[in-house]
Curated annotation (Swiss-Prot):
Designated name of the protein: Lysozyme C
Entry superkingdom: Eukaryota
Compartments in which it is found: Secreted
Main location: secreted
Gene designation: LYZ
Other facts noted in the record for this chain: Lysozyme C is capable of both hydrolysis and transglycosylation; it also shows a slight esterase activity. It acts rapidly on both peptide-substituted and unsubstituted peptidoglycan, and slowly on chitin oligosaccharides.
Top-rank EC class of the record's enzyme: hydrolase
Subunit structure: Monomer.
Function (record text): Lysozymes have primarily a bacteriolytic function; those in tissues and body fluids are associated with the monocyte-macrophage system and enhance the activity of immunoagents.
CDD domains referenced in this protein's UniProt entry, alphabetically: LYZ_C
Length: 129
């Protein structure tokens, strides 16, 4: 599923991401835009053999199990395929675990490069939340 911007913002808010660990909703919507273009089915292979899955491009080396990443830690205790669902609950729950780590949202390269230090509230402007 490809979410609309405000549709995704509403879903993320409902699932408790707004100001989770101090990151406003705009940060999460911005990260999803530049990680997956709001597409829950997005997958991208990395040079180390791991793969990033779903709307927030969660990595199989650390966070989920795809059965083909050597030494996967599966810290979210989830199958990577669950992160491709049109229902983003599994992705959000895993993202909460990731952002609680010491790096916070810096774990997402696209957030670090495209969202950090910008006016992320623009991503939720005009949305009825």
């Amino acid at each position: 599923k490809v979410y609309g911007r405000c549709e995704l913002a509403a879903a993320m808010k409902r699932l408790g991401l707004d100001n989770y660990r101090g990151y406003s909703l705009g940060n999460w919507v911005c990260a999803a835009k530049f990680e997956s273009n709001f597409n829950t089915h997005a997958t991208n292979r990395n040079t180390d053999g791991s793969t990033d899955y779903g709307i927030l491009q969660i990595n199989s080396r650390w966070w989920c199990n795809d059965g083909r990443t050597p030494g996967s830690r599966n810290l979210c205790h989830i199958s990577c395929s669950a992160l491709l669902s049109s229902d983003i609950t599994a992705s959000v729950n895993c993202a909460k675990k990731i952002v609680s780590d010491r790096n916070g949202m810096n774990a997402w390269v696209a957030w670090r490069n495209r969202c950090k230090g910008t006016d992320v509230n623009a991503w939720i402007r005009g949305c009825r939340l």
